[in-house]
Each structure stands twice: as structure tokens, then as C-alpha cells.
Amino acid sequence: MDLKTVTGAAVELSDTAFGREFNEALVHQVVTAYLAGARQGTRAQKTRAEVSGGGIKPWRQKGTGRARAGSIRSPIWRGGGRAFAAKPQDWSQKVNRKMYRGAMQCILAELIRQERLILVEEISVSGPKTKELIAKLGELNASRALIVTKEVDENLYLAARNIPHVNVLDTSEVDPVSLIAFDKVIMTVEAAKQFEEALA
């Protein structure tokens, strides 16, 4: 597959890594699993059995005119236990390496088809200057963008840190969610070659 950088230089990338047909079910499964794995799973609530108190019947069964009640810790009472109490649980899902690789291939190929992937020879700033990076993003028409480089340049990272909807990652940090979360993905040729090597 032949692609062009912003300056018009031709870049040849493998069809396996960047030309795969989009598989929505696969991408959905991998993204869902990734988001599930990010959940803390530490939520804990008490059932009526675990809430303190409520051992005695609050009033007799008949003759008071009130609705019958057996415990002040019933789920319908204020201060009662939860009917279906949440407990700590592990939300992580298993994703095979082959599935993960396939989802990444699908997403990268779809970014190219939708013209959301911008290839550049390099992207850098002279110092940690946000204004300079905003100007460069303006030239590329990418105000909400993920910048992917082979290795994160500290100046670039610091310059992007204060811009909303802009993030800088190196190839080892990129995941399916980060790729689809931005309108545009600005990728250096070096980073694209590294993805080609990892995904081909």
C-alpha cells in the first residue's frame, strides 16, 4: 500500500498492517474488553444481612393499622440494605494476541479510508511551546488529534499537555481506544514503520 506524507513523499506500507478490511465485531469486542479492564471493580455495598441492626421486629404484625414490617433494615427502608448490593469484582476480559493485533490492523486501515490518518516525516517543536504546536496543528487542520511518534519527545509532550483534545504517545503506548478517540491521528513515518513491523 502506497501512502503519501503531508509533504508529498511516498511511503510504502504493508497491506497486512494497514489494508485490512474493517471487522466491526472484532473492534467492538477488543475495545469493550480494553475499557472493561480499566474498571477498578472496587465498588462495595451492604445487603440487608450485612447492615448493622434490624434484628427486632419494629412493631407487632397486626392491630397497629400500619403496614407490616419485620426489620428496619429492609431495602425499602431508609438506612436499609441494598436489594442487589454491588460487590468487588474483576471486570477484565481475555483478549487473544491475534484478536488484539487484528483490531489494531482494522482501526489503522479504517483511519486511512476515512482520511483521518496524517503521515508526517517528523513533528517537533523547538521548546516546550504550546503556541508553536497549535500553529503546526492548524496547518495540518487537526485541532483534536493524537500524535504518535516512535519515541516521545519531551518538548512535544510538554507543548501538547495544555491543549484540550490533543495527546502525544509513542508506539508502545498506543491502544485501540486511543486511536479511535480522536478526530485525527498524526503519525510519523518511523512510527508507521514500527506498527508495520509489529502488526504484519
From Swiss-Prot:
NCBIfam families: rplD_bact. Belongs to the universal ribosomal protein uL4 family. GO terms for biological process: translation. It holds the Pfam family Ribosomal_L4. Keywords: Ribonucleoprotein, Ribosomal protein, RNA-binding, rRNA-binding. InterPro entries: Ribosomal_uL4, Ribosomal_uL4-like, Ribosomal_uL4_dom_sf. One of its GO terms (cellular component) is ribosome. The gene is rplD. It comes from Psychrobacter cryohalolentis (strain ATCC BAA-1226 / DSM 17306 / VKM B-2378 / K5). Gene3D superfamilies: 3.40.1370.10. One of the primary rRNA binding proteins, this protein initially binds near the 5'-end of the 23S rRNA. It is important during the early stages of 50S assembly. It makes multiple contacts with different domains of the 23S rRNA in the assembled 50S subunit and ribosome. Part of the 50S ribosomal subunit. This is Large ribosomal subunit protein uL4. GO terms for molecular function: rRNA binding; structural constituent of ribosome. Residues 45-64 are annotated as: Disordered. It comes from the Bacteria.
